[in-house]
A protein has these predicted regions:
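Ribonuclease/tRNase effector modules and their secretory precursors
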Residues: 1-93
Length: 93
């Protein structure tokens, strides 16, 4: 897979991974989800239906930020059909 992907291409692959249950959560992501009161299920819902922003290269990999309402979930691809959530947060109003 050649990265960075366009937001629409990333969206399609992220949604497939979410539907197929091929989403892993880094320990940092789990901590951030808990801190902001976001469940794993809600994070997966964001991946299934959120808006994917353009990729950013951070810490040696391409990251894709997915947003829905006030929740942001950032993923990196392990493979074309498997993503890892690296962090997440709830935007403060």
């Amino acid at each position: 897979m050649r990265e960075p992907l366009s937001p629409s291409a990333a969206r399609d692959l992220i949604r497939l991974a979410a539907v197929d249950g091929k989403v892993a959560f880094a320990s940092h992501a789990r901590e951030e989800l808990a801190k902001d009161g976001i469940t794993i299920d809600r994070a997966v819902e964001v991946l299934r239906g959120g808006v994917v922003e353009p990729a950013e290269f951070e810490h040696g990999s391409w990251r894709y930020r997915v947003r829905a309402a006030t929740i942001y979930v950032v993923v990196a691809f392990r493979t074309e059909d498997h993503v890892v959530v690296v962090t997440a947060w709830r935007r403060k109003r």
